[in-house]
Design a protein with these regions (language model features):
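Conserved beta-strand termini and adjacent loop/short-helix elements that scaffold enzyme active sites
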Residues: 8, 70-72, 178
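Internal catalytic-core helix/loop-beta-alpha segment
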Residues: 96-126
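Generic beta-sheet signal
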Residues: 5, 124-135
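Acidic, low-complexity terminal tails and accessory targeting/binding regions
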Residues: 1, 64, 75-85, 124-126, ...
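Active-site signature of alpha/beta-hydrolase-fold catalytic machinery across serine-
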Residues: 57, 139, 143
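Phosphate-coordination/substrate-recognition cap region in phosphate-metabolizing enzymes
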Residues: 29-100, 201-202
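Loop-to-helix element that buttresses phosphate recognition and phosphoryl-transfer chemistry
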Residues: 3-58, 105-110
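Active-site metal-binding loops of divalent metal-dependent hydrolases
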Residues: 11, 134, 181
Length: 202
């Protein structure tokens, strides 16, 4: 009765808010090949083109699995933390978004947490894939680990890296893997990731 939530950040896009770049398309295809044997019951993706296109390319390796757009998997600020709780750089970043946008994002993120980070009381084990964006992915990981609500800040994912969270009745959620890009060749890793956080020779 374990519920496995697979989270994938969209592929590299060019421009950032546009469709996938050629590299992003290849990242998505390779991610689909990696996940082809996982018995998914559903694939969800954010409504923006880069997430929708990534999901479509992944789903090409998952015949018969329904693919659905979801606003919950979109690109938004997932919490509205007190600036006093944040490092200054994070506080300035959050403050750059309008208050109404932050409030709406926090409500949507809570709905996403309730929808995706929950145990499955049925049997057998279940598997779902969510193709989403950096902020929400970090938020879901932070919530699975009972971290402070603002701790999605600084949790960065590479494009098309795979994160897996397992939920079981009566137990805290378990982070199985985070930001795993081992299915991508070196030249397709680390896109979308802050250069200042990339370790040398990895």
């Amino acid at each position: 009765m374990t519920r496995f939530l697979f989270l994938v950040r969209h592929g590299d896009a060019s421009p950032h808010d546009g469709p996938l770049s050629p590299a992003g398309q290849e990242q998505a295809r390779l991610t689909g090949r990696r996940l082809k044997d996982v018995p998914f019951s559903a694939v969800y993706h954010g409504p923006l083109p880069r997430a929708a296109q990534t999901a479509k390319l992944i789903a090409a390796s998952l015949p018969g699995v329904p693919v659905t757009a979801s606003e919950l998997a979109g690109d938004y600020i997932p919490s509205n933390p007190d600036p006093e709780d944040l490092p200054r750089r994070f506080a300035d970043f959050v403050a750059s978004f309008p208050a109404a946008e932050r409030a709406a994002g926090a409500a949507r993120a809570e709905a996403a947490r309730e929808r995706f980070i929950r145990p499955d009381d049925g049997a057998p084990d279940s598997y779902e894939l969510v193709v989403t964006h950096n902020f929400l992915l970090g938020w879901l990981v932070s919530q699975a680990l009972d971290a402070p609500p603002w701790r999605w800040l600084g949790l960065n994912q590479m494009n098309c890296a795979v994160t897996v969270i397992a939920c079981q009745p009566g137990l805290p959620a378990a982070l199985i893997t985070f930001n795993d890009a081992s299915h991508l060749p070196p030249e397709l890793r680390w896109t979308g990731f802050p250069a200042t956080l990339r370790p040398a020779s990895i």
